[in-house]
Amino acid sequence: MKKIIHLEKILWDECDKITKLKVNKDQKSFVAPNADSLIDAYFAITEEGIKVYPFGIYYGRKAVGFIMIAFDCPWATKYYGLPEKFYYIWRFMIDRKYQGQGFGKEALRLAIKFVKTFPAGKSEACWLSYEPENEGARSLYLKVGFVERLDLHKEDMEIPAVLKL
């Protein structure tokens, strides 16, 4: 059954809900804490001028996850040799209490729908990357249409994947 969720811009009074979300213990090495992600977004915006879109993932009024999308990330271009002018799902997590219920798949669909509005400019692709050991993320990303780019994968790096827009 499809879960009715929505993405919300993170406002000051909602920030605490987002920073309290946690993944399972065995997933902690795969994603940064949400507080760290919000700090990263702040510095990317203020120091590098990168367009960053952090969203809370909500089921009704209940925060169940976090996703952060960026546009034209110089570090991804550098590490993976990606083209300029692309969207990048920089961070994505579903709280441990809500995993396995369809929230992740639906949240990614909503994020892709948002990206296809081209809020920061036109692009041909949306990229993301994940740890090679993170089979759950890999399976989810492939289900929603991302294609692994193993030709760009380097040892000790995350695996890049692309979705044509």
Predicted regions located by residue number:
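Acetyl-CoA-dependent GNAT
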Residues: 4, 9-91, 95-97, 114-118, ...
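Conserved acetyl-CoA pyrophosphate-binding loop and the N-cap/start of the following alpha-helix
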Residues: 98, 102-110
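Conserved beta-strand-loop-alpha-helix junction that forms the acyl-donor binding cleft
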Residues: 122-138, 154-158
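Terminal substrate-recognition subdomain of acyl/acetyltransferases
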Residues: 142, 147, 152-165
